[in-house]
């Protein structure tokens, strides 16, 4: 089941639990706006290249739309649509005043020079500048993009609208970025895991973790979990997978990855088949890579007692059912990985106020939001007698439905 079908399925299940009528259901499901633009740029060799860019603006009932821009050769309109919808529910679960959006350009960043990436970003911004804005739609980095990409968008947008640092988040600190933003999603995963384990009478200390994906989110989560006494027993990334049942030295691994661009060849652990990473013996599994990696083919072999979804849509609905029967507790993506968008909200607030928070305040506020979010999800689970995924979906959908109704949009 693809990401859009799975997201729609979860929405429909939540809608039924909430008793929403069909008219309101359709209002919530259909995107506010879908944008498709053609971006033609001169390449460094003088030739012209054309790329297709997308931006799906899903919902703005609770505030400006919010979501990343990804640069990837397989940017798919259906996936962008699904991720935009997920952002709507995610921001509602986090209880921050945003709706959902997502965008991307079908390109391979590694095949483009820095100057070509800059030209592409600026042309894309020129095409959509009148459809985004501080109080309209606020982009952020995603797969294949970074703070420099956001700096180019900010600069190009400002040519049309005046200096507007709050138009994007995930910016460099020197242009109004927030302290703590780089670690935010990974730190949010730590706080989410802490809340889940605490609810089951456990703590991070002494638990064995497996982390699939060692990019920004996975590496920060692993580092912070280790600092809290957790043991990382296996890690994987695009280069390979490693395992050490006694615990991997994450500080040494981070140094190795920086020098070698991947976990492959790390001497402090044994090399294993990357396809086996999800079924390694552990207490907590953290998928922090791509979507759809936990499916009906491997779900039956998963040994973890808890799954904390750091990636977007890592678990197929068929796998959900198999894991539920095994008693595996899944903390869903729309709560577990909301730390990034929450600190993006803090960045936006700081930009609008023209006042910078220190990192301690950012992290303290993030922990408070994550703890409140977990309590709110659990309350919905009790109300509707459902699992954590449906608890999160009913929480998010209900908040958006109430805002939609109050604004008179469902009529």
UniProtKB/Swiss-Prot annotation:
Coiled coil: none
EC number(s) on file: 1.4.1.3
Primary enzyme class: oxidoreductase
UniProt keyword annotation of Nucleotidyltransferase present: no
Gene this chain is encoded by: GDHB
CDD domains: NAD_bind_1_Glu_DH
Stated name of the protein: Glutamate dehydrogenase B
Organism: Nicotiana plumbaginifolia (Leadwort-leaved tobacco)
One Pfam family this sequence matches: ELFV_dehydrog_N
């Amino acid at each position: 089941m693809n990401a859009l079908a799975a997201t729609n399925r979860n929405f429909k299940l939540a809608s039924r639990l909430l008793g929403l009528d069909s008219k309101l259901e359709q209002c919530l499901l259909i995107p506010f706006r879908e944008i498709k633009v053609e971006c033609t740029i001169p390449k460094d060799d003088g030739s012209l290249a054309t790329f297709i860019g997308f931006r799906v603006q899903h919902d703005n009932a609770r505030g400006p739309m919010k979501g990343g821009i990804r640069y990837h050769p397989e940017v798919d309109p259906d996936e962008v649509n699904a991720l935009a919808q997920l952002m709507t529910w995610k921001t509602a679960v986090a209880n921050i005043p945003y709706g959902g959006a997502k965008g991307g350009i079908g390109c391979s960043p590694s095949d483009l020079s820095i100057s070509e990436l800059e030209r592409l970003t600026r042309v894309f911004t020129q095409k959509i500048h009148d459809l985004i804005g501080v109080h309209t739609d606020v982009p952020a980095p995603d797969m294949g993009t970074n703070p420099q990409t956001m700096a180019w968008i900010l600069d190009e947008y400002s040519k049309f609208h005046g200096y507007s640092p709050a138009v994007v988040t995930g910016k460099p600190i020197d242009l109004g970025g927030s302290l703590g933003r780089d670690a935010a999603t990974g730190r949010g995963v730590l706080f989410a895991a802490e809340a889940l384990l605490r609810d089951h009478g456990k703590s991070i200390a002494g638990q064995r973790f497996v982390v699939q994906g060692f990019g920004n989110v996975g590496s920060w989560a692993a580092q912070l979990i280790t600092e809290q006494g957790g043991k990382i027993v296996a890690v994987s990334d695009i280069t390979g997978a490693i395992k050490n049942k006694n615990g991997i030295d994450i500080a040494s691994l981070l140094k190795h990855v920086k020098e070698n661009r991947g976990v492959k060849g790390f001497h402090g652990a044994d090399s294993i088949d990357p396809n086996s990473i999800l079924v390694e013996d552990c207490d907590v599994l953290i998928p922090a890579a791509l979507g759809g990696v936990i499916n009906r083919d491997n779900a039956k072999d998963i040994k973890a007692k808890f799954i904390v979804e750091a990636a977007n849509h890592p678990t197929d609905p068929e796998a959900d059912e198999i894991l539920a029967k095994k008693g595996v507790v899944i903390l869903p993506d729309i709560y577990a990985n909301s730390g990034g968008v929450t600190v993006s909200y803090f960045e936006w607030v700081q930009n609008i106020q023209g006042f910078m928070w220190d990192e301690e305040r950012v992290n303290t506020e993030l922990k408070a939001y994550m703890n409140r979010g977990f309590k709110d999800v659990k309350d919905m689970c009790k109300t509707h007698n459902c699992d954590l995924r449906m608890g999160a979906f009913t929480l998010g959908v209900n908040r958006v439905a109430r805002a939609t109704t109050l604004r008179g949009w469902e009529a």
